[in-house]
Amino acid sequence: MRNIKLKIQYDGTDYHGWQIQKNDITVQETVKKAVQKIVNEDVHLTGCGRTDTGVHAENYVCNFFTNSRIPSEKLPYALNTYLPNDIVCFEAEDTDENFHSNSSAVKKRYVYKILNREFPDAVMNRYSWHYKYPLDIEKMRIAAKAFIGEHDFIGFASSGFSVKTTVRKIYSLDVYKNGDIITIDVVGNGFLYNMVRIIAGTLVFVGGGKINPNDMADIINSKDRERAGITAPPQGLCLKEVYY
């Protein structure tokens, strides 16, 4: 039996996240149905992680086992004939039978975009958080340094999740500005439920003067969700890369 690895990208605006849900349209269900039409058998489609409602992905990785003999290089073309315009498969390959798109991942990179100006943008409103109040990007950069390294990030997670450990390692966390767009770029070995969005919301609080950047290490070590910032809205978040 073959293990097929897919790379897809999607605009998450009109989906209730990645994971299949009983009464909602999800990315996983949509891709799974397209795959099954091609291979003509039931498959279990495994994803590299759960993205929430409204969150986007440029390089999402998933895999499935199949007895189909269709050449992997033809799969993207076949799948895209069945997928809607807001989901695209751009790569497929046969991979090792032990490959698991989630547990085999060693790092993930997310980007969060903030439109920081008075008026919203009709094009960017699906892909950024419009925040009209001034933000001090230098303070945000100072605070971002505190996240680097291995920490217990329980204070930067929403409730309603179950994991073996809440310790995660952040390899890099950069904040930069291009015109009216502030970008938060983070790479880690894994992320808790809503962790990146809470980091983004916290850095916005820092940039807006609600949190002192020099207090960030203490806030992380406190493991207190109440001391961190808000959970930033989903549309600004995009999964950029998964590393294996």
Model-based region annotation:
Residues 1-244:
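Structured-RNA-binding interfaces characteristic of tRNA pseudouridine synthases
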